[in-house]
Amino acid sequence: MKFSTVILAAGKGTRMHSNMPKVLHTLAGKPMVKHVIDTCNNLGAQNIHLVYGHGGDQMQQALVNENVNWVLQAQQLGTGHAVDQASPHFQDDEKILVLYGDVPLISEDTIESLLEAQPTDGIALLTVVLEDPTGYGRIVRKRGPVVAIVEQKDASEEQKLIKEVNTGVLVATGRDLKRWLAGLNNNNAQGEYYLTDVIAAAHDEGRAVEAVHPSHSIEVEGVNDRIQLARLERAFQARQAKKLLEQGVMLRDPARFDLRGTLQCGSDVEIDVNVIIEGNVSIGNNVVIGAGSILKDCEIDDNTVIRPYSVIEGATVGENCTVGPFTRLRPGAELRDDAHVGNFVEMKNARLGEGSKANHLTYLGDAEIGKGVNVGAGVITCNYDGANKHKTVIGDDVFVGSDCQLVAPVTIGNGATIGAGTTLTKNVAEGELVITRAPERKIAGWQRPAKKK
């Protein structure tokens, strides 16, 4: 279905108490307006006209990769005025969908229903029935059909009793919308040009006005302050958690789980409390994710256990691995099958081979580590000389004792042993033992200093 979209995003958002434009505040790790843009793109919008005002530079920087038509509303004179700024770009025969950058949860299904309901010569608008309609424009009907929308400040006492309210979302053809926008005036309590007045204009011309309801009222809730944003965040996360539960993922507490990207899960996956998923994450079968872990843009293969409070970003973890607790895998880290990394181990741009282990207090950066390697506690690959990064290569079946510094570039051959406390600066051949230690001294009769009383 061919259509173009106008997204209104010019508001300052005073009640957010922020220097950032309201629509750039994030929901599930993504700016609110980006949720709306993504929904439009998923539905195949031909053009997206983004009406902006406050914080234009911040807006364009944050959305630099988005294919949108930037439309400036220099003065905020109402929703009708905002849409009118984009009207020169409307094609006469195309459907124009009006959305809002601070209403991030509107669904594709609801938009499709609205587009399908739009009469050829009329308007389709999205309405919702609220127990407390205070603050919303009321839907005025006459023997069934919608004839007008009256804003709260302009409503009579009788009209204020109406519970069906306007969401601001509507669809009309470009030709009609341009004509109706041109006829708007600001003779109202706010002194603004209301988009809602196009409903009365359509009715006066005898055009049909169809009302469509969203699947859930949360879809059309807007954000004016941080309390409302927090409410939508939890609603969004609850919806994501429900989908995962329906797919068979075991969330130990759905209320304490945050998905801020996309998650692909195999069967029998268990996710403990306070886990955060960001970016694109893939999890295989029979995987356990421990409490408080953060996974971002990573791949976890089958039968792997991620113990609590591990942070994995831009990394790949193979089958039957154990990670954590308190492990950090940074971009470029790779664990081959059956590898183990334990508490306070950090890896970046490094590969740990099949069956290899680094269980305690270790940094592995710019390293290639073979199969069956044991990396002792306190081992550091010294990969940076103050100007450039250098690589450490460790062969298969190597034993690296505790508290070693491997000063790159350095290569250790298969089966070699590096004694505890060694500072290694030269390559090691296969099977060699290398030890560098300060001479041990014993001082007989030494006594500790006594504490002063």
Curated annotation (Swiss-Prot):
Keywords linked to the UniProt accession: Acyltransferase, Cell shape, Cell wall biogenesis/degradation, Cytoplasm, Magnesium, Metal-binding, Multifunctional enzyme, Nucleotidyltransferase, Peptidoglycan synthesis, Repeat, Transferase
Pathway assignment: Nucleotide-sugar biosynthesis; UDP-N-acetyl-alpha-D-glucosamine biosynthesis; N-acetyl-alpha-D-glucosamine 1-phosphate from alpha-D-glucosamine 6-phosphate (route II): step 2/2; Nucleotide-sugar biosynthesis; UDP-N-acetyl-alpha-D-glucosamine biosynthesis; UDP-N-acetyl-alpha-D-glucosamine from N-acetyl-alpha-D-glucosamine 1-phosphate: step 1/1; Bacterial outer membrane biogenesis; LPS lipid A biosynthesis
Subunit structure: Homotrimer.
General function of this protein: Catalyzes the last two sequential reactions in the de novo biosynthetic pathway for UDP-N-acetylglucosamine (UDP-GlcNAc). The C-terminal domain catalyzes the transfer of acetyl group from acetyl coenzyme A to glucosamine-1-phosphate (GlcN-1-P) to produce N-acetylglucosamine-1-phosphate (GlcNAc-1-P), which is converted into UDP-GlcNAc by the transfer of uridine 5-monophosphate (from uridine 5-triphosphate), a reaction catalyzed by the N-terminal domain.
Region (Pyrophosphorylase) residue spans: 1-226
Binding residues for UDP-N-acetyl-alpha-D-glucosamine: 8-11, 22, 73, 78-79, 100-102, 137, 151, 166, 224, 330, 348, 363, 374
Residues at the catalytic site: H360
Binding positions (Mg(2+)): D102, N224
Binding site for acetyl-CoA: A377, N383, Y384, S402, A420, R437
Assigned GO CC terms: cytoplasm; membrane
Broad class of enzyme this protein falls into: transferase
GO biological process, one term: lipid A biosynthetic process
Name assigned to this protein: Bifunctional protein GlmU
Reaction equations catalysed: alpha-D-glucosamine 1-phosphate + acetyl-CoA = N-acetyl-alpha-D-glucosamine 1-phosphate + CoA + H(+); N-acetyl-alpha-D-glucosamine 1-phosphate + UTP + H(+) = UDP-N-acetyl-alpha-D-glucosamine + diphosphate
InterPro entries in the cross-refs: Bifunctional_GlmU, GlmU-like, GlmU_C_LbH, Hexapep, MobA-like_NTP_Trfase, Nucleotide-diphossugar_trans, Trimer_LpxA-like_sf
Entries under HAMAP family matching the protein: GlmU
GO MF annotations in UniProt: glucosamine-1-phosphate N-acetyltransferase activity; magnesium ion binding; UDP-N-acetylglucosamine diphosphorylase activity
Co-factor(s): Mg(2+)
Residue ranges, annotated region (Linker): 227-247
Family per record: In the N-terminal section; belongs to the N-acetylglucosamine-1-phosphate uridyltransferase family. In the C-terminal section; belongs to the transferase hexapeptide repeat family.
UniProt-annotated stretches for the region N-acetyltransferase: 248-453
Compartment(s) where it occurs, according to its Swiss-Prot or TrEMBL record: Cytoplasm
EC number: 2.7.7.23, 2.3.1.157
Cofactor: how bound: Binds 1 Mg(2+) ion per subunit.
Naturally occurring in which organism (per UniProt): Vibrio cholerae serotype O1 (strain M66-2)
